[in-house]
């Protein structure tokens, strides 16, 4: 008898109306490229990402550099092979919160092709249009038992790979 009894059906609450907000239009160019294309002087400053998870002080520093006239913030990718907050994630926050052009460095040392493509797609989705392709410093000898170099390609091949992805059209529009 217990098995024959069906659970009582309750009426579901009406579904919430989905937002009709549209996604922002993808920008075709940025201030950095506009200045370069116009032959204007561009001020680029490198500011390494923090070693801690708090970006507050970093963003304050970036804001001061922007107010002082910096057009572009370059962000190293684990300089001298020491772990820091990911340069691409920091670039996304700088772009989103400050509206400043950010150029994350992308090293060959830490990512294979699949991880590189995934990161480039994410950067593009966040509005970060440029990367600096670099080979990257090797992992210090003392740390090589625990941390491994990837180096699936060098910076020249990485740049060629990025150009080929940009040429795929719908998946990752140009410029990258």
PLM segments and residue spans:
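Hydrophobic faces of well-ordered beta-strands that scaffold small-molecule active sites
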Residues: 1, 43-47, 73-75, 102-106, ...
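Glycine-rich phosphate-binding active-site loops on the catalytic face of alpha/beta enzymes
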Residues: 1-9, 127-140
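Alpha-helix-loop-beta-strand connector modules within alpha/beta enzyme cores
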Residues: 2-11, 81-105, 150-175
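N-terminal amphipathic alpha-helix/helix-capping segment at the start of soluble metabolic enzymes
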Residues: 4-56, 60, 170-175
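Conserved anion-binding
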Residues: 15-21, 25, 130-176
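Short, acidic/polar
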Residues: 52-65, 87, 113-120
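Glycine-rich, proline-tolerant flexible connector loops at the mouths of alpha/beta enzymes
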Residues: 70-90, 139-150
């Amino acid at each position: 008898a217990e098995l024959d009894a069906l659970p009582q059906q309750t009426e579901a609450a009406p579904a919430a109306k989905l937002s009709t907000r549209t996604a922002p239009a993808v920008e075709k160019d940025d201030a950095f490229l506009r200045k370069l294309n116009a032959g204007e002087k561009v001020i680029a400053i490198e500011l390494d990402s923090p070693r801690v998870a708090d970006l507050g002080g970093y963003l304050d520093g970036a804001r001061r550099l922007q107010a002082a006239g910096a057009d572009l913030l370059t962000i190293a990718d684990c300089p001298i092979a020491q772990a820091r907050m990911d340069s691409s994630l920091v670039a996304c926050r700088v772009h989103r919160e400050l509206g400043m052009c950010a150029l994350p460095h992308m090293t060959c040392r830490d990512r294979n092709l699949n991880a590189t493509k995934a990161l480039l797609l994410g950067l593009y989705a966040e509005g970060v249009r440029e990367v600096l392709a670099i080979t990257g410093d090797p992992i210090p000898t003392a740390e090589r038992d625990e941390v491994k170099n990837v180096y699936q390609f060098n910076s020249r091949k990485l740049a060629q790979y990025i150009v080929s992805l940009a040429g795929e059209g719908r998946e990752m529009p140009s410029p990258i």
